[in-house]
Every structure is written in C-alpha cells, then in structure tokens.
Amino acid sequence: MEGAGRDGNPLGGYRIGKTLGIGSFGKVKIAEHILTGHKVAIKILNRRKIKSMEMEEKVKREIKILRLFMHPHIIRLYEVIDTPADIYVVMEYVKSGELFDYIVEKGRLQEEEARRFFQQIISGVEYCHRNMVVHRDLKPENLLLDSKCNVKIADFGLSNVMRDGHFLKTSCGSPNYAAPEVISGKLYAGPEVDVWSCGVILYALLCGTLPFDDENIPNLFKKIKGGIYTLPSHLSPLARDLIPRMLVVDPMKRITIREIREHQWFTVGLPRYLAVPPPDTAQQVKKLDDETLNDVINMGFDKNQLIESLHKRLQNEATVAYYLLLDNRLRTTSGYLGAEFHESMESSLAQVTPAETPNSATDHRQHGHMESPGFGLRHHFAADRKWALGLQSRAHPREIITEVLKALQELNVCWKKIGHYNMKCRWSPSFPSHESMMHNNHGFGAESAIIETDDSEKSTHTVKFEIQLYKTRDEKYLLDLQRVSGPQLLFLDLCSAFLTQLRVL
C-alpha cells in the first residue's frame, strides 16, 4: 500500500507521539501529519496477534470497507500502511474521550442534549446499514466525542470482525448492550441488533443508568432475553414511547431506523444536515473542494494526478493530505458536512448523468466495498434497502442446514460447527472423500465433521470459508458464504458447485 514516507520509513509522513491506548491487536498512538500539521490517531495492528486469533483476512476486509466511509459522525480512516510486522491504520483523532465517560461524569442528560447525541448516532448507524455494514457492538465506549462534543462512531467494521455465534467468546466488552438474539445465538440479519443497542444507549443518555444490569451474568441474560427493565417517571411521554419500541425482544417487531427517524421525539430540532442521509461515497467523491485542491497543489502535487486519484479513491500522500485538510475545513467553517456543503453537493449531483452512476459503484466494489445494489438511490433510507446478500429461502432453518450439509458432503468439504447456524469449512479439490466422516442425519451433532490436518497438508489449493444462516425481516432465511483464506477463483468454483447441489434454495 502507498503511504510510506519518502525516506522509506513506513510512518515517515508522520511525527509519532504518545500512546493513547492499548487494544487486543496493538497500540493506538497520536501523531502529526507532517504535510498538513493536523493530528491523527494511528492504530497499530500486530500481524502476529491478528494471525494467532485467525482474524487477519477479516481485519483486512473490514478495513477496506471502512476506508470508503465518508460520514460526519463516523471516525474517518485516512490511510492504511502495510508492513511485514504490522498494519498501521491512520484515523481521525478526537480528543474529548468516550461518551461513556461523559455520561459517568454528568449523569443523566437533559433531553435536548441526549437527543442531539442520539440524532448523530442514528445518522452514522443508518449510513453504515445503507452500505451493508453492521456494527454489532455499539456502546458508549465505542462512541467518541470531538472538541465540539460531536459524536464519532469508532471501530465501525473493525469491531465487526467477530465471528457470528462467537459474540460472548470474542467480545471483551460487556453484554449489557447486546440484543437478545445475539446472546441467545439465534438467527439475525444484522440491522435489528444495532437498533437494540441504540435503544440501550438512549436509555443510558436519558437515565444515567443501564436498562439491563446485574452482577450475575445468568440473571443479566434473563433480563435481556425477557426485556425486563423499568422506565423512570422523569422521562417525557415521547421518550417513554420510543425506548420500548427499540427494546422489543422480537427483532422482527422492533422499530426500524427509518421509523426512528420519523418518530416525534427524534425529529425535534433535527439539524438540516442530518435531515436526510448523506450521499453515497461514490457520489461524494464527484464533488471536489476547489480551495482544498489548491492547498494540496501548493504542496507540490500535480493537479491532474490529484483529481484522478480522488475520483478513483486511490490512497497516496496527496489524497491523504486532501482529506485531512478538507475535514478540518468543514469542522472549522460550515460544521460537519453542513447544510451549505449538502446544497452544493445536491446541485453538483443533479448534473451527473445516469450512465455515470453504475460505473462509480463498480469502481468502489473493486476497491473492496461489499457488493450491493442501489448505490445511486440517494433518497432511500436504510429500511428501503433490501439486504440481499447470499441465498434466500423460505424453508425451515433445519431443512436448509440439512441440505447444506448434504451439499458439503457431496463436495468433500470438511466443516466444524462454531455457532447454532454457523460453521467454518475447508475444501481442497485434492482431498479424498470424507463421506465416512459425515453424520448420517446431516444435522449438527455434538461433534463436527472436520478433519484436523497438520500444517504439511495445507496448501495454496485449499479454501477456508464460513457459512452463516440469517433470518430476514420478511420471514425468509438467508445463507451467506464468506471466504476466509485461499484462492478467490477456487472459492468461486466451489460456490458454483455448491449452488448446483442445493435443493431448497
């Protein structure tokens, strides 16, 4: 990846400062971007630690997704620098700490202040859902505050490297914010999980306490699964209406992001720039800021190369400088993607021909974005977008799993159960038949039908992937296959063969 300084030092473009924190994969340090003088936070992800936790491929994938996000209330990722030992993730620096500490210090907030935070959170969550990314670990500790007390959702995507079905084993945080379907290991599509967590956060903002809290974990789980909590009498009628609609145990009956946006409590004093979702990234990059362009050109970069790099979303010294300068200008002048910016964006996008939009979407998918239709649906909310990843079926979950296991057997795929409806698999065209290893009833038993081979048997001709079954809002079930490692083309061959074997999808 581009990003190394001119002296060969991977971080030569930055002056490294003190350590801000230490996480599971490594440290986070403050740094100064030398060309612009702006501060950034550099997350140092240790490759050895990531590999030992089998997270390497997922971390890379989620970073690619996060690099495309451009939203005022999501921490911006400016640059990713790869070295043999570490991955350096250069991100927006915010200095006012976590929303968690803010709540602890101030206690319950007045409705106006709580609503302002909540509007920003929902806007950021909605943006990610529209781009087919779910956080699954939203909590005040992951919500940072900048110098103007604006919310920044942190680790969006990076926190989502946890395997489905492994939430309690892999999450180092508290399950207080987790939805019932998550801690129960039930099927879930994703967006509803974040709505529940946002409901817990809203409760904490308005009440200064958590709705579900107990030192005894089994008791805590019982409260969450039963939706057992109390609403304080000081809450306004509209707040008392919204919170219970978010904390509905059945995810299919839970309020949606769009319905939250339309709720009377939410719409009070809603800023103009949050009144509609921001443009998709593919459209945002078409609008370039002339003043910022000139600033970067004055640093010695070629204008044509800079514009081309920005349109193609390339990462290099010039584009990193551009976005650092642009973000700082928006913060200090018109605010976070303020109304003026939106109006100029709208007028610019109105001139974009329909033929341009699909190409832009395609370009972004090639740069690591999750493939999804509807990139150009500017005015559609998250609830209008259909989550159509994977294969859909109305068959019973057990029937689907039975057919999946039959298909895996026919293809000589080894598998191991890691969740109720989640398994990790390994396939190599050269493997001999493993039919004798499969369960005759084709269902999840106490043991898994995976052959544990030693390292000598692993080769570049082996594909590792995961299968997860989800439930969608329209009472369908969705089967998703996700490559973990191995040749991409070999994985596509497997998917094609797998499709021909299935009988219920």
From Swiss-Prot:
InterPro entries assigned: KA1/Ssp2_C (IPR028375), KA1_dom (IPR001772), Kinase-like_dom_sf (IPR011009), Prot_kinase_dom (IPR000719), Protein_kinase_ATP_BS (IPR017441), Ser/Thr_kinase_AS (IPR008271), UBA (IPR015940)
Entry GO terms, CC: nucleus
Catalytic residues in the record: 137
Keywords: ATP-binding, Kinase, Nucleotide-binding, Nucleus, Serine/threonine-protein kinase, Transferase
Domain UBA: from-to ranges: 287-327
EC number: 2.7.11.1
Broad enzyme group: transferase
Pfam family, one: Pkinase
Entry's induction text: By glucose starvation (at protein level).
One Gene Ontology molecular-function label: protein serine kinase activity
Catalytically driven reaction(s): L-seryl-[protein] + ATP = O-phospho-L-seryl-[protein] + ADP + H(+); L-threonyl-[protein] + ATP = O-phospho-L-threonyl-[protein] + ADP + H(+)
Region of interest called Disordered, as start-end residue ranges on this chain: 347-372
Entry function: Serine/threonine-protein kinase involved in sugar signaling during germination and seedling growth. Negative regulators of sugar response complex (SRC) in alpha-amylase gene promoters, thus relieving SRC sugar repression in a MYBS1-dependent manner. Required for MYBS1 and AAMY3 accumulation under glucose starvation.
The protein's name in its UniProt record: Serine/threonine protein kinase OSK1
Lineage summary: Eukaryota, Viridiplantae, Streptophyta, Embryophyta, Tracheophyta
Gene name per UniProt: OSK1
